[in-house]
Amino acid sequence: MMKETEDVVLMHLDFLPLKSNVNIHIGNALQMDWASIISPSKLSYIMGNPPFVGQSVRTKDQAHDMNDIWGQGEIETKLDYVICWYKKALDYINTSSTNIEIAFVSTNSICQGESVPTFWKKMIDSGAEIHFAYRSFVWDSEANEKAAVHCVIIGFSNFSRSHTKIIYTEETKTKAEHINPYLLDAPDIWITNRINKPQNGLPKMTTGS
């Protein structure tokens, strides 16, 4: 894509055209103290595309990150690695009186199943409010080996938005009064797993979404 652009504009382009105010920090974002890098009072937005990694494929270091962020043995450590960025970002903005909005691309699994009554319940109890949501879409890229994953984009913060909330579905956008963790214009509801045996005699489901 870069070469094609150069052919069109007839000039060489820098891959990373950073000329001034360069402030890149290299390291594990989940282990770093964000406030030591930049004070939240200097920010208006936090945006990113954190890695999606399921429990069955994460590394030992990633499992360690999950335990550090959520606590050893907590149910959230069984969910997708990407939720660590949500808590890290919310904890960060909760230390400041500045209104900061956050938006992350994530696997859509964080808005399904056990993720909602566990991860999202804790987020909302800690002050999170969803401001906008782009509902499930298939991830696409120019890579030869594309990841087979469905994504969402969720914008949230720790303050109530004064203007309308929006839910995006493909080419359609809909105004919403309230966006719940299922990315619906509806009140927050918490559908928990059942501990009783199925009434129809079928075996219990052990893995699924």
Where do the model's predicted regions map?
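Conserved residues in the N-terminal Rossmann fold of short-chain dehydrogenase/reductase
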Residues: 25-26
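Short, conserved active-site loop motifs that form the nucleotide-linked donor/cofactor pocket
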Residues: 22
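Signature of N6-adenine DNA methyltransferases within the class I
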Residues: 1-14, 18-19, 29-209
